Amino acid sequence: DSGGKFVIEEKFVGEEFSLMSFCDGKSLKHMPIVQDHKRAYEGDSGPNTGGMGTYTDSNHLLPFLNTDDVNEAKMINEATINALRDKYDDKYKGILYGGFMATRDGVKLIEYNARFGDPEAMNVLSLLKTDFIDICFGITNCELDKIQVQFKKQATVCKYTVPEGYPDNPIKGQSININNITNPDQLYYASVDIENGQLIESGSRTMAVVGMADTISEAEVFAEREVSSIIG
């Protein structure tokens, strides 16, 4: 309409990735880079979800990123924390979860969250070698710079199971059988209930499995095998 208002948005074309960092208000310790896949169906099709699966590589980069891309994302996270402290006197403590896109014009920041990503957290925390409690104390006491945060040099693939019809019209109340899972330590519960001692799907992402191996392809094979063994 003549005289109306409109918004111009810049379109970015590239590959998205996530960089999460532990923050104590002055120091940051970065976690491995993760890529999330949000489309509900095979072949990156269907509606968006909270995240159907994620992966990391053994070198803590991703196949489509180079070292300069990762360093640029780290610098953006660091600049954000420094600006909060220096300009607004806000020493942010916790998890800084940056959503980025690698484009032909460089790395672009898409969004921030003040929390772990789901499912990204399951990838990076599965790789964490340092005691998580020590990291938490380092954050609260502003002594994160004294802690050597280390991660295993392995690849991970995380896959979610979801109810039939998810996300638009999920069927609720279906029973779940996990007796065939071979590594329950890498099974993570999400939207499930218990009725009469039986696990029940409650409508959203149900549970996730993380596969760890030397390569992404090997980790994917393990995650797929475990997910396929869940009956429900």
Question: What does each model-found stretch correspond to?
Answer:
Residues 3-4, 84, 225-232:
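Short arginine-rich
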Residues 21-23, 161-163, 211-213:
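Short beta-strand-to-loop capping motifs
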Residues 172-175, 220-227:
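Short amphipathic alpha-helices in soluble, non-transmembrane regions
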Residues 1-119:
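Internal nucleotide-binding/catalytic subdomain
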Residues 41-43, 146-148, 193-199:
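Short beta-strand/turn micro-motifs at beta-sheet edges
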Residues 171-208:
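Generic long, charged, amphipathic alpha-helical segments
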Residues 71-96, 113-184:
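Active-site "cap" helix and flanking loop/linker of ATP-utilizing ligase/carboxylase catalytic domains
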Residues 54, 205-213:
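Short, well-ordered beta-strand elements within core beta-sheets of diverse protein domains
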